[in-house]
């Protein structure tokens, strides 16, 4: 047996096929993160959504209270004073026509793209490049705004966008495996609360189907969703 497959087998053997309480699950997540890099902590949440209907789609943003653990590179499409404001607020890139042309040529050295409303006609042509990567600015995600300073500060602090995919599953990173269990729990609570708060109007009956967490290279660990609702973590 190779070293890699032996490692994976040993890690998987630590996980039982049952719903875990949050603190035990997060300790297991950290314990099973054995890759040679700092792994992300991921949540995969299956919801009872039929996303072909507009009133059963979920797409929104939230700010993780303990941040993402990732340095976010932000690009801003704006002109004049707004471009200067963006750089002063911590944007890594800022420009208008020149930046749009660079993106058209394949320059995607950023994690988030913000645009001022007057730039929307200019970036419409970027849909085919940015859309599949989830980088296209939109008012709903807070990435089309005149207040570029606040937007940059929020994303740098840990604001992220998430959506339910075609199968009704939300895939979201809620920190890094070198975070404390308490910090991971606070971030995971924020995820759960955001999903409940933004429950689509068309959903009837049971909303949550399953709730799993894992590290980037680790096994899935099932969580007991009722514990989050009761806020009684032990």
From Swiss-Prot:
Gene that specifies this protein = rpl1
> Which PROSITE patterns does this chain map to?
RIBOSOMAL_L1
The record's family statement is:
Belongs to the universal ribosomal protein uL1 family.
Where is this gene product found?
Plastid, Chloroplast
Q: Which SUPFAM superfamilies match?
A: Ribosomal protein L1
What is the official name of this protein in its record?
Large ribosomal subunit protein uL1c
- What's this chain's function? Binds directly to 23S rRNA. Might be involved in E site tRNA release (Potential).
Enumerate the UniProt keywords alphabetically.
Chloroplast, Plastid, Ribonucleoprotein, Ribosomal protein, RNA-binding, rRNA-binding
Protein source organism: Guillardia theta (Cryptophyte)
Superkingdom, according to UniProt? Eukaryota
């Amino acid at each position: 047996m190779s070293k890699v497959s032996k490692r994976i087998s040993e890690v998987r053997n630590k996980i039982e096929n049952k719903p875990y309480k949050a603190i035990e699950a997060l300790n297991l997540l950290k314990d099973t993160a054995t890759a040679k890099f700092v792994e992300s902590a991921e949540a995969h949440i299956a919801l009872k959504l039929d996303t072909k209907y507009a009133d059963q789609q979920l797409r929104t943003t939230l700010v993780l209270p303990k941040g993402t653990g990732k340095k976010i590179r932000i690009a801003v499409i704006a002109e004049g004073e707004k471009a200067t404001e963006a750089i002063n607020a911590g944007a890594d890139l800022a420009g208008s026509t020149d930046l749009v042309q660079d993106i058209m040529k394949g320059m995607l050295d950023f994690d988030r793209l913000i645009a001022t409303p007057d730039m929307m006609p200019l970036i419409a042509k970027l849909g085919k490049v940015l859309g599949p990567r989830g980088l296209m600015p939109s008012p709903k995600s807070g990435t089309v705004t005149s207040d570029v300073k606040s937007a940059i500060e929020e994303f740098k602090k840990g604001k992220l966008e998430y959506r339910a995919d075609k199968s009704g599953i939300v895939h979201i990173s809620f920190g890094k495996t070198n975070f404390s269990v308490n910090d991971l729990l606070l971030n995971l609570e924020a995820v759960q609360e955001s999903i409940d708060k933004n429950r689509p109007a068309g959903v009837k009956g049971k909303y949550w189907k399953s709730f799993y967490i894992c590290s980037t290279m680790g096994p899935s660990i099932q969580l007991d969703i009722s514990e989050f609702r009761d806020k009684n973590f032990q």
